[in-house]
Structure formats: C-alpha cells, structure tokens
Swiss-Prot record:
Taxonomic classification: Archaea, Methanobacteriati, Methanobacteriota, Stenosarchaea group, Methanomicrobia
The keyword Ribonucleoprotein belongs to this UniProt entry's keyword annotation: yes
Name of this chain's protein: Large ribosomal subunit protein eL40
Organism: Methanoculleus marisnigri (strain ATCC 35101 / DSM 1498 / JR1)
Family affiliation: Belongs to the eukaryotic ribosomal protein eL40 family.
Keywords, sorted A to Z: Ribonucleoprotein, Ribosomal protein
A Gene Ontology BP annotation from the UniProt entry: translation
InterPro entries hit by this protein: Ribosomal_eL40_arc, Ribosomal_eL40_dom, Ribosomal_eL40_sf, Ribosomal_zn-bd
NCBIfam families noted in UniProt: PRK04136.1
Cellular component terms per the entry's GO annotation: ribonucleoprotein complex; ribosome
Gene: rpl40e
Gene Ontology MF term list: structural constituent of ribosome
Length: 48
C-alpha cells in the first residue's frame, strides 16, 4: 500500500478501538480516548 516500508510501519502498526475507532499505540492495553479494552490490530491489507 505505502511506497516506503517506514511509512507503512507508521500507518499500520497501530491498534484500533472497537468502541470509538480511535488509533492507539501498538502496545496499548486500553483506549486512550474512551478507556475501553476492546482493541484490535489495524488490518494490514485493505478490503476490496
């Protein structure tokens, strides 16, 4: 997707909160915005 591996790592190495859709650090255990612990890793491939 991204042109450079550094940019791809910066864009895709995050966790997404399933309650409020906030972007969180990859090592986060709870959401920085709403406090929920329902986090998922961001998808590495886009769905068509």
């Amino acid at each position: 997707m991204a042109r450079f591996p550094e940019a791809e790592a910066r864009l895709l190495n995050v966790k997404i909160c399933m309650k409020c859709n906030a972007r969180n650090a990859i090592r986060a255990t709870s959401c920085r915005k709403c406090g929920s612990d329902e986090l998922r890793a961001k998808s590495k491939e886009r769905k068509a």
